[in-house]
Structure formats: structure tokens, C-alpha cells
Amino acid sequence: MTLTIIGTGSMGMAIAHGLKERYTLEFVARDLSKLETIKNEYQANIYPLENFDITNKNIILAVKPYALESVGKQLKGRANTLYSVLAGSSLDALNTHIATQSSVRIMPNVSAKFKASTSVMTGDEHKRAEAEEIFSAIGDTFWVGSEKEIDIATAIAGSGPALLTLVAEAMMDGLVKEGMKRPDATGITNSLFKGFAPLIASNHPALIKDSVMSPGGTTAAAYAMLEEGAVRSSFIKAVGEAFKVTQK
């Protein structure tokens, strides 16, 4: 299968990097100089956006959400399937601006580059198996039953990596504050996140916490400080705020 990626920003290229070993890719964008660079790197066909014919193509739309209308005006023909990774852009909006036989919304994240994305999706049910096959090439996939659910999931699936960078940076800064060299603080924190992934995949967060929290110990003291600073509440509110933005 050939997949046509429209949009060559960070998300589009992260997805492309994850898919390149399994699919034939072609790229469409406004920036012709960037397209030439991509052509050399991926040995792929490239096309300017203006008047690009999407007839019978399987499209991965990875432009900025605000550009949906203007990009749609540049395209002609009717796509076979439109896979959109535009946060907050509804299926109705997509189908209004881009002619397609079928459409699926996906919310991946930039970890797609490392085949470790969390991709939440919804759309035409008959395209579910195909969508899961394509996006399983870049990580885990989760099909949900409504657009509201994918908008909620955006707060974690899409924005989650940025939220976790706050945690990672704060941990690094804490180690440096207490006297550790920055490279060591960075390496230790990175290793912690690497080891935590398989741990959280097979254990409930509360069980992990309880297993390492000793009475009067270091973990209990640190955890109490986070609760005092309303970190848990702030994260819950952050998810809510991200969801609100998708509804605008």
C-alpha cells in the first residue's frame, strides 16, 4: 500500500519515520525545498500541494488544524481513505473540506518516530482493521467509539509527552539542586523513564507506589510533598484544559 502524507511538520515526519520500513510513502507539502530533502532521505515521490489530485489515494493528513480549510482548497479529486491526525478537527469538518470515501481520526504522538506512539482512533468502522494495521507500525493503537473520547484522549495520547517532559525536567533539576552534575542527572532520569514503561504496563500505579513506599521513608516524604503541592490535582486539571481546547 502507498500512503500519501500531506504535511511535513514534526508529527508528519515522525509518522513517516515509523512507517517507512513497512509502506511505500509519498509526500505532499508547500515547502518545495523541504520536499527535496525528504525525497533524498526517503527515496520517495514528492508533490507540491497546489492542485494535488488525491483521487483513490490513502491520505495521512498531518497539517496544522488551522490549515485544514486552506489545504482542502488546494486539493482536487476524491481520496479513498483520509487518515487525519489533526487534533480537534471533527470528522464532519474533515469531510466538509476534503472529499473522501472514508475517514478516520487518529491522535498519535511524536514517539511514532521510535515506533512507540500511543495512537487513539475513531471513524468509519469498516476502516478500523486497516487503520489499526497501519498505525500499529508506529506503536500501540486504541479504537474508541466516539469523537468525544478521542478528544479526551488527546490530552494524554497527543499532549502527554509534553506533560511528562515537565516531570522529567523537574526531577533532573531536583537532582542538580542537591549537587549532582547535569549529565548524570539527565542520564539517571532518562533511565528511570525507560525502566518505568514496562512496569506501568503490567501494574496499577497505586500498587507500584505502595510497593516502594516504606513507613517514614524517602518515597513517603517525597510523595507527601507532591500532594502538598497539588501535583495530582494539577495534572487532572491539565487533562481537562487540553480537552476544552479540542472543543473550541
What are these regions, as identified by a protein language model?
Residues T154-A162, K209:
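A short glycine-threonine-serine/GTX helix/turn-capping micro-motif
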Residues E50-D53, N58-K127:
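Glycine/small-residue-rich loop that forms an oxyanion/phosphate-binding "nest" at active or ligand-binding sites
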Residues G187-N190, K194-K248:
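NAD(P)-dependent Rossmann-like dehydrogenase/reductase catalytic/cofactor-binding core
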Residues E41, A93-S102, T118-I152, L163-S202, ...:
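Internal alpha-helical scaffold of NAD(P)-dependent oxidoreductase catalytic cores
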Residues M1-E50, N58, A116, G174-K177:
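NAD(P)+-binding Rossmann beta1-loop-alpha1 motif at the extreme N-terminus of oxidoreductases
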Residues I6, A14, Y47-F52, I60, ...:
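Non-catalytic terminal and connector segments of soluble metabolic enzymes
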Residues T2, T24-E26, T81, S102, ...:
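Residues at the starts of beta-strands that form the adenosine-phosphate
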